[in-house]
């Protein structure tokens, strides 16, 4: 299953950009150059600062987490994404390596998309396609990532 993700604004992104713009407008009275610089930075942040993701055809805003780990985690992760109930400690796996796990998730909706890559010839190549996880399996993966 090929799922494309596009960057979108989150409410937090808009609030931060608005605060920087307002700080620029407010400081324009004291120092016009500083005010213009801050307001310009706020406008640029509004254009380019996007921390949320949306899957094609879905409305939920997702958060992205990427983790590099050793090759010994490849098969257990494939098994977990395939539906087997496996307990993994990904906290000690995050030391880097040739396997990359990218997870796009929305904890409130109990929805996650996982992509698993292997590193070879200086590029990441998909080890498995994008896998959509729901409810308990998504919740378990999100809790493993936060350990």
Model-derived regions: residue spans:
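N-terminal low-complexity, intrinsically disordered "leader/linker" segments enriched in small/polar
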Residues: 2-5, 55-59, 104
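Transmembrane-cytosolic junction motif
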Residues: 11, 36-68
């Amino acid at each position: 299953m090929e799922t494309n993700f596009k960057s979108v604004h989150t409410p937090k992104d808009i609030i931060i950009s608005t605060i920087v713009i307002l700080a620029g407008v407010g400081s324009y009275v004291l120092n016009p150059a500083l005010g213009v610089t801050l307001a310009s930075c706020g406008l640029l942040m509004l254009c380019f600062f996007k921390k949320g993701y949306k899957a094609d055809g879905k409305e939920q805003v997702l958060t992205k987490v990427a983790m590099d780990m050793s090759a010994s985690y490849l098969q257990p992760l494939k098994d977990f994404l395939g539906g087997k109930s496996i307990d993994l400690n990904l906290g000690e796996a995050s030391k880097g390596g040739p396997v990359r796990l990218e997870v796009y998730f929305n904890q409130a909706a109990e929805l996650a998309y996982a992509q698993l890559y292997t590193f070879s010839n200086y590029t990441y190549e998909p080890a498995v396609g994008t896998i959509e996880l729901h409810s308990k399996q998504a919740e378990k993966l999100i809790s493993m990532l936060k350990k």
